A protein has these predicted regions:
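Positively charged n-region of N-terminal signal peptides that target proteins for export
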Residues: 1-5, 119
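Membrane-proximal, proline-rich intrinsically disordered regions
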Residues: 24-32
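C-terminal motif of bacterial Sec signal peptides marking the signal peptidase cleavage site
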Residues: 16-17
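Substrate-binding and catalytic surfaces of secreted/luminal carbohydrate-active proteins
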Residues: 31-68, 174-176, 207-215, 219-224, ...
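Sec-dependent N-terminal signal peptides
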Residues: 6-11
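N-terminal catalytic cores of secreted or lumenal carbohydrate-active enzymes
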Residues: 54-223, 255
Length: 483
């Protein structure tokens, strides 16, 4: 009996020693972490069976112990986010102006209101006609830069809509791009195809941007950024387009546009390329030009060829430059299974774009009609493109791209920082995550499960120690906002 007592005493002492060691370490056991309160968490869900499409739901707390843990750490920060959004093309603006006042207000609130809508805060504009416009025009159709003037179509459609949007959300940022220089500056003498005549028009071309920025400012619209040419290596015979080599772009920025913006005291940022990932070496060429580099804020990309993985080369070579996604269109070519397309957008485009240093994410047309237009007169390109909204009269249909952008815009504000987010445990490869710290201190988490099983996951905030256990359904996307 005495022997048994001694053995039991030794075992108890060892167990006490282990407990004391864990307590002294300052790290409580996982199950001892406090839970988030209901009023500290907001959740939006989209799932395969379409029961939920960016639907806000209460958190269904459970106390099951999970071996899968998502840890977010707001003390480790990465790049700043400039917003999520899309293109307000001439066609999009026209469709909004054709709506009744009440219907238009509701549609615009659904896009730009951070409380009632999805909180988009980044809009791309075309300087003159694009492939989705109500006419063929620039801001200086008559030869001579002294003839610069805001086009009547933009006075009628675009500018009133932009002012209405700013009244809804004053935090909107605008980036503007020409699809073509005025025809009199080009060797083709046309808005479609061709290139600039050469150095003889570089000064006027640079002044064209300065006058545009000043004209929009006079309307109460601040242009945060510009690119020199939409899809600089693409030439179309049926809609406005223009070829511009990397060397030419560097010359114009370094010797003409950059100095002019600085002289005029305009803080508008310059982004280069504005074309697909597969020709990222174009951006490298421009950035390596020392004369141009000092005026360049970053690079802009489209998602029609190549992959965002190449962006790691840019962030390594030029860590001080931003990276924008300025265009990606949805369309009839997408999978008929909407969740497959949503997972493609997230896993192949948005997540790797941001993980590799991207500062925003934008789709193309914010609105088109059910006939995939209106196209620019004479236009034959992208007849099956889809807008973020489909608008016919006062009828509005949010498309898949609306829910994609909403999963970001609902929880991430301009000025947020991407933060460290890690998966701990034997997570399936089908689960992807991304986390952010908002300027107001709230934390945002996106999680994607494109697998076939429900996963019980503990989500832990390292800054507060708080946690919640959540059942992540198969084939679903969630957006969490944590206070």
């Amino acid at each position: 009996m005495k022997t048994k007592f001694i053995i039991f005493s030794l075992f108890a002492a060892l167990m006490t020693s282990c407990v004391d060691y864990n307590t002294d370490s300052g790290f409580p056991k996982e199950e001892e972490n406090p839970n988030f309160e209901q009023n500290e968490v907001r959740l939006w869900v989209t799932n395969q069976n379409k029961v939920y499409k960016l639907t806000e739901l209460p958190i269904d707390y459970n106390d099951e112990i999970s071996k899968l843990v998502i840890r977010i750490n707001p003390s480790i920060t990465y790049q700043t986010i400039d917003g999520f959004g899309g293109g307000m093309t001439g066609s999009s603006a026209y469709l909004f102006t054709q709506m009744s006042t009440e219907a238009r207000s509701k549609a615009l609130h659904s896009l730009f209101d951070p409380k009632e809508g999805i909180g988009l805060e980044h809009i791309r504009l075309s300087i003159g006609a694009s492939d989705f416009s109500m006419g063929l025009y620039t801001y200086c159709d008559k030869a001579g830069i002294e003839n610069f003037a805001v086009p009547e179509l933009d006075k009628r459609d675009l500018i009133p809509v932009l002012k209405e949007i700013l009244a809804i959300n004053p935090n909107i940022k605008f980036i503007a791009s020409p699809w073509s220089a005025p025809a009199w500056m080009k060797d083709s003498g046309l808005l479609n195809k061709g290139k600039l005549k050469g150095e003889e028009v570089y000064d006027d071309f640079a002044t064209y941007f300065v006058k545009y920025i000043q004209a929009m400012k006079a309307e109460g619209i601040t242009i945060q950024a510009i690119t020199l040419q939409n899809e600089a290596m693409f030439e179309s015979n049926v809609h406005p387009s223009m070829i511009m080599s990397a060397e030419e772009q560097a010359t114009i920025i370094g010797q003409y546009l950059g100095p002019k913006l600085r002289k005029e005291g305009l803080p508008t940022e310059i982004y280069v390329l504005d074309h697909n990932f597969d020709i990222y070496d174009y951006a490298l060429t421009v950035l390596k030009n020392k004369e141009a580099n000092e005026y360049i804020a970053g690079t802009a990309f489209h998602g029609y060829a190549g992959t965002p993985s190449v962006l790691s080369n840019l962030t390594k070579a030029f860590p001080d430059k931003k990276i924008y996604m300025t265009e990606l269109s949805g369309g009839e070519w997408n999978e008929k299974d909407e969740m497959k397309t949503l997972f493609y957008y997230l896993n192949d485009m948005a997540f790797p774009m941001i993980a590799n240093g991207g500062n925003n994410f934008m789709m193309f047309n914010l609105a088109l009609n059910s006939q995939h237009g209106p196209l620019t007169p004479g236009g034959e390109f992208c007849k099956d493109c889809r807008g973020v909204l489909t608008i016919d009269g006062d009828e509005v249909l949010p498309e898949l791209e609306y829910y994609l952008l909403g999963h970001f815009g609902k929880i991430i504000r301009t000025g947020a920082k991407r933060i460290e987010a890690n998966l701990q445990g034997m997570f399936p490869e089908d689960i992807k995550i991304m986390a952010f710290l908002n300027p107001d201190g709230t934390r945002a988490l996106l999680a994607v499960n494109n697998g076939g099983t429900t996963e019980n996951i503990t989500i832990k905030d390292e800054s507060t120690g708080k946690k919640l256990v959540y059942k992540l359904a198969p084939s679903s996307v969630i957006s969490l906002l944590l206070k």
